[in-house]
Design a protein with these regions (language model features):
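N-terminal targeting/trafficking signals and adjacent low-complexity tails
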Residues: 432, 526, 576, 617-666
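Conserved interdomain hinge at the start of the Helicase C-terminal
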Residues: 384, 441-478
Length: 666
C-alpha cells in the first residue's frame, strides 16, 4: 500500500531545479525554459520572425472581432496575398477540449489553466488529443499546417477556433505558433500590457507598431493589471498546503527546491503572524511592509523565490496534492491551487520594491485581513513597451482630456491628431444649465443629494425637457447612490409618476446580466410608444456603469443626453487618496481628468453616424467653468452655450429639434 501511494504521489513531487542564479543564464534563456506554456510560441532554429509587425490591442473580444471584419473589407484583407493576420485570445475563448472547458465553467480560469497544463504534461497517459508534443515531427508538421491555414486569409477568432476543430488542432496554441509569422496580431489588453504574458508568448515588440484602441482605459488598465490581492483565508490555506507538502515530500526535496520551500514557509508564517498582529487598516511602502513582516523576511531574495515558483510550477504541485488528499474524504476537488497562485501574484508585485508601489492592508472583523499591492504610477509598467516599439498609437473615439497620457511617453515622442466629428456641427447642441426652473442653483455636490428641494428641482427640469425631446432620452447620474436618492424622493412626491406620463422611465439595473432586457424594453417603447407614455422613453443610467461604456445609443435611442452633476470619484477612498498623494502637484489635474473622462465617455454613447444628431444638457453650474469646459471633446465644446436662465435652455432645445425636423423633411 505504501509503495503504491508513493508511486501515485510522484506526479506531485517537484522536479530537480537548477537555479539560473548559479548557472549564469540570461533572462532571455530563462524565459525559453518555460517548457509548457510557451512551447508552441517559442522560436525554432532557422524560424525567422516576420518584422516589423503591427500589434493591435483592445479591451474586449467583440472589438477585436470588429477590427478583423473591417480589415477584410480593405484591399489588405483581399486578393491573392492578403495581410497575414492572427488573433490571440484566452483559453476560455479558444480551448476546444470539452473537459477543460467544463472545469473552467465550474471552477474558473485558474482551474481551467491548471487542467490544461496537466493534459499538456500527459501524466498517466492522459495527454490533450489536440496538442501534439513539440518533439513529435508529425505533430510539428500538423501545427505548421494549422499556421499556414490560419495565415492564408484574414480570419477572426471564431474562424480560428473552427479551424482548430476541423483540423483536430488546439487553436489556443495554434494561434500562438502562428503569431511569429503574422504581420498583424490582434490581442486583448492583458497579453500586451503584462510583461509575463509577453514573455510567455515570446512577443517581440522591437521595431513594431503597437496600436491600443479604446485607449481612454489604458491608465486604469495598467494599474489594475499590476495590482495583486492576497486574503487571510488564502494565506491560511497556503500555509496548510506547504505543511502538508513537506510532511509528504520533505525527505525527497533536494538543493534549491528544499531551500525555497523552507523560505516560502517562513514568508507565509510571517504573513500569517502579521494578520494576527494588525488591528486596523493601514498603508505601507514596500520596504516598510517587508520590514513589518519581521525576522529575516526582509533578507529574502523575493525575485529568486518568485522565479522558482514560476519555473517549477510548485503552486500546481502543492494544490494538486492537496486536492488528492481532499478527495480521499470529500466528493469533489476544491481546486486549492488558487491560493498558491494568489500568493505567487502577490510576490511578483512585491518584487518591485520601487517608490511607486504601496501595500494597502484592510482589517475586517468578518472577512479577516486583506493585502493589496497598488501600483501608483503607470509609467514604469508602460515603459518597456515604449522603449521597444517603433511607434505607439493610442486611439479612441473620446480621448480628452489628454494631459494624463502625455506623461506615459517621452515628450519628444508625443504628438496628437484629432479628427473632427463625422456629423456636421449643426447636428450637435450643447447647453450648460446652471439654474433650475424655479431659480434653484444646480450644483450636485455630495450634500445636495440629501436636499429634497434640489431633487424636486431636478424632477421639474427633466419634466420640462421631456415635453420637447422626441423619442429616447438618456439621463446619467454620478452613481447608483445618487440615482437611488432621486428615485426615492420622486416616488414619495409622485414626480416619477408625472415623468412617466410623458416618457416611460426605465433605470439601469445594478446586475449587468439584466441590462439587455432593459435596453430591449427601452428600444421597444421608443419604436412604439404606449398611450400612457406617448413621448417615448427616458433611461436613467449611471456614469461608469455598463450603459456609459459599452452601449451605443444611435438615432432615436438618444436624441438627448443629460449629465446631472460631475461624477468625481470618491476622493476619500484609500486607493485614490494614495494615487493623488503620489501625484503631488499634478494630483488635482488627475482628479478632474478622471471625472471628465467619465463624462466624455458617457456623452460619446450618442451620435454614431453622419446622419445622427443629439442634444447634450449639462445640469450643473460647474460646467460653466473653464477648467471643466476645456476638458470636453472638441465637437461638443464648440457647440456649448451657457444659459443664464432655465427658460433659455428650453428655447434653445426646442429650436434645435425644430431645425432637425425641418432638415429631415427637406
Amino acid at each position: 500500500r505504501r509503495e503504491k501511494d508513493t508511486l501515485s504521489d510522484d506526479e506531485f513531487l517537484v522536479n530537480d531545479y537548477h537555479d539560473a542564479q548559479d548557472s549564469f543564464l540570461s533572462a532571455e534563456v530563462r524565459a525559453m525554459m518555460h517548457t509548457y506554456e510557451s512551447q508552441w510560441s517559442a522560436p525554432n532554429i532557422g524560424d525567422d520572425e516576420t518584422r516589423p509587425k503591427i500589434f493591435y490591442a483592445s479591451r474586449t473580444h467583440s472589438q477585436l472581432v470588429q477590427l478583423v471584419h473591417e480589415v477584410k473589407r480593405t484591399p489588405y484583407g483581399q486578393g491573392d496575398e492578403p495581410v497575414r493576420c492572427v488573433s490571440l485570445g484566452s483559453r476560455k475563448q479558444m480551448c476546444i477540449h470539452h473537459d477543460v472547458r467544463r472545469i473552467g465553467a465550474l471552477f474558473g480560469t485558474e482551474a481551467m489553466n491548471e487542467r490544461c497544463l496537466e493534459l499538456m504534461e500527459g501524466k498517466k497517459g492522459k495527454r490533450c488529443p489536440y496538442l501534439p508534443a513539440q518533439s513529435d515531427p508529425v505533430g510539428r508538421a500538423e501545427m505548421d499546417t494549422y499556421r499556414d491555414h490560419a495565415l492564408s486569409h484574414v480570419q477572426d477568432m471564431e474562424d480560428l477556433v473552427q479551424l482548430g476543430k476541423d483540423m483536430h488542432m488546439c487553436p489556443y496554441f495554434g494561434t500562438r505558433h502562428s503569431a511569429r509569422h503574422a504581420e498583424l496580431v490582434t490581442l486583448p489588453y492583458n497579453l500586451l500590457l503584462l510583461r509575463d504574458a509577453r514573455e510567455a508568448l515570446h512577443l517581440t515588440l522591437d521595431g513594431s507598431v503597437v496600436i491600443i484602441d479604446e485607449a481612454h482605459n489604458l491608465i486604469d488598465t495598467l494599474l489594475a493589471t499590476y495590482a495583486a490581492e492576497l486574503t487571510q483565508a488564502q494565506i491560511e490555506q497556503a500555509v496548510q498546503q506547504v505543511e502538508m507538502y513537506l510532511r509528504r515530500f520533505s525527505m525527497r526535496l533536494r538543493g534549491t527546491n528544499e531551500e525555497q520551500v523552507r523560505i516560502l514557509q517562513v514568508l507565509l508564517r510571517a504573513l500569517q503572524g502579521l494578520c494576527v498582529e494588525l488591528t486596523e487598516s493601514q498603508t505601507f511602502s514596500l520596504p516598510d511592509f517587508m520590514s513589518r513582516l519581521g525576522g529575516s523576511v526582509d533578507q529574502i531574495n523575493l525575485v529568486r523565490l518568485e522565479r522558482w515558483l514560476k519555473d517549477t510550477r510548485i503552486a500546481r504541485k502543492m494544490g494538486g496534492y492537496a486536492d488528492k488528499v481532499w478527495l480521499e474524504t470529500h466528493a469533489a476537488p476544491a481546486h486549492r491551487a488558487v491560493a498558491m497562485h494568489a500568493l505567487e501574484a502577490f510576490l511578483l508585485a512585491l518584487c518591485n520594491r520601487a517608490k511607486n508601489g504601496r501595500v494597502l492592508v484592510t482589517v475586517d472583523k468578518m472577512q479577516g485581513v486583506r493585502f493589496k499591492y497598488l501600483l501608483l504610477d503607470p509609467r514604469d509598467a508602460f515603459e518597456p513597451i515604449v522603449s521597444s516599439a517603433r511607434a505607439i498609437i493610442l486611439a479612441g473615439g473620446t480621448m480628452e482630456p489628454m494631459s494624463d497620457f502625455e506623461q506615459l511617453v517621452p515628450r519628444d515622442r508625443f504628438t496628437t491628431f484629432s479628427c473632427g466629428h463625422i456629423v456636421p456641427s449643426s447636428h450637435v447642441m450643447g447647453a450648460v444649465v446652471p439654474l433650475g426652473p424655479k431659480g434653484q442653483t444646480l450644483e450636485f455636490t455630495h450634500a445636495s443629494w440629501q436636499q429634497p428641494a434640489m431633487l424636486d428641482e431636478l424632477a421639474v427640469a427633466l419634466g420640462n425637457y421631456t415635453n420637447i425631446v422626441p423619442h429616447g432620452m438618456v439621463v446619467f447620474f454620478p452613481s447608483y447612490a445618487t440615482l437611488d436618492a432621486a428615485l426615492a424622493r420622486w416616488q414619495h412626491t409622485h414626480a416619477l409618476e408625472r415623468l412617466s406620463r410623458r416618457k416611460k422611465v426605465l433605470t439601469e439595473p445594478k446586475d449587468a446580466k439584466d441590462v439587455d432586457a432593459v435596453l430591449q424594453q427601452y428600444a421597444a417603447t421608443i419604436a412604439d410608444p404606449p398611450p400612457s407614455s406617448p413621448k417615448g422613453a427616458m433611461l436613467l443610467a449611471v456614469v461608469g456603469a455598463k450603459l456609459s461604456e459599452g452601449i451605443n445609443f444611435q438615432d432615436d435611442l438618444a436624441r438627448c443626453v443629460v449629465m446631472i452633476g460631475l461624477p468625481f470619484p470618491h476622493a476619500k477612498s484609500r486607493e485614490l487618496a494614495e494615487r493623488l498623494a503620489f501625484a503631488g502637484e499634478d494630483g488635482r489635474d488627475m482628479y478632474v481628468n478622471m471625472c471628465m473622462r467619465a463624462v466624455n465617455q458617457s456623452m460619446g454613447r450618442a451620435i454614431r453616424h453622419r446622419a445622427d444628431y443629439a442634444a447634450f444638457l449639462l445640469l450643473d453650474r460647474r460646467y460653466a467653468r473653464e477648467q471643466i469646459q476645456s476638458r470636453l471633446p472638441g465637437w461638443i465644446r464648440t457647440q456649448v452655450q451657457v444659459h443664464d436662465r432655465f427658460g433659455s435652455s428650453i428655447r434653445a432645445l426646442a429650436q434645435f429639434f425644430q431645425q432637425m425636423r425641418y432638415r429631415a423633411a427637406t
